[in-house]
């Protein structure tokens, strides 16, 4: 059975899973589904058509699933879908999608730190860290194991590649390639995210191949398709390199140089 504080306001149609803890002054809307073992400390608002998995933890004043800030919103049913074992620190905001039938989606094992904002239609993978006051604008895609530094802001429709890292206060207006370290305003690709690769168990062989790809793509003055051709010809085609190439080839906003 869930443990619910008497001051919490929960709609009778909401679904609250077993072993959930709902603290003082939380508000849970009609179309919310909480899986098992979620912990809501106090003053949490979860609203809209929101589906949340198991084992998530919400700290005071987090707001999840509420109506988008996007002025293009015209009504309809929009969704917020969240996986398992995520942490939402104080004053985090996660907004629902804009278009009818669309969703803001988050995977599992993510850490969303205090005052961060996840806007409408964001697709956020697994094992992501969004540091304090980090901002993801609408339709941003964040791949697994990416880290967004404190006060960093990501423009709408940008993508952050797997195991990439943004320095604090970075302003991102184009895609950030996988495995790269990006910093500054305007943002620049500074180096390979060596520490991130090591922490996530990337092999030495793959790390060396990623460094080769980085040097050819960012440091040799090659442009676009020419850089991709050279990397395919000169760098071992390991899965990490293929992912890097697939990412940069499909970029619509360009890659942060």
Annotate each PLM feature:
Residues 1-7, 12, 18-19, 55, ...:
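Terminal amphipathic alpha-helical/low-complexity segments used for targeting or macromolecular assembly
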């Amino acid at each position: 059975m869930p443990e619910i504080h008497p001051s919490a306001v929960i709609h009778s149609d909401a679904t609250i899973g077993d072993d959930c803890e709902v603290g003082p002054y939380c508000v849970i809307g009609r179309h919310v589904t909480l899986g098992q073992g979620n912990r809501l400390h106090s003053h949490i608002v979860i609203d809209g058509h929101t589906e949340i998995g198991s084992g998530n933890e919400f700290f005071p004043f987090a707001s999840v699933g509420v109506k988008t800030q996007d002025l293009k919103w015209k009504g309809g049913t929009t969704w917020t879908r969240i996986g398992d074992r995520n942490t939402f620190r104080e004053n985090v905001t996660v907004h629902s999608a804009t278009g009818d039938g669309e969703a803001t989606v988050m995977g599992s094992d993510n850490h969303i730190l205090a005052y961060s904002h996840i806007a409408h239609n964001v697709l956020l993978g697994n094992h992501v860290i969004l540091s304090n006051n980090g901002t993801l604008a609408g339709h941003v895609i964040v791949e697994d194991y990416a880290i967004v530094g404190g006060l960093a802001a990501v423009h709408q429709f940008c993508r952050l590649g797997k195991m990439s890292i943004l320095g604090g206060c970075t302003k991102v207006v184009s895609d950030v390639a996988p495995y790269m370290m990006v910093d500054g305003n305007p943002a620049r690709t500074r180096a390979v995210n060596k520490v991130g690769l090591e922490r996530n168990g990337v092999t030495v062989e793959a790390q060396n191949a990623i460094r080769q790809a980085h040097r050819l793509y960012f440091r040799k003055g090659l442009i676009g398709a020419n850089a991709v051709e050279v990397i395919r010809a000169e760098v071992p085609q390991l899965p990490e390199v293929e992912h890097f190439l697939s990412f940069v080839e499909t970029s619509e906003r360009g890659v942060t140089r």
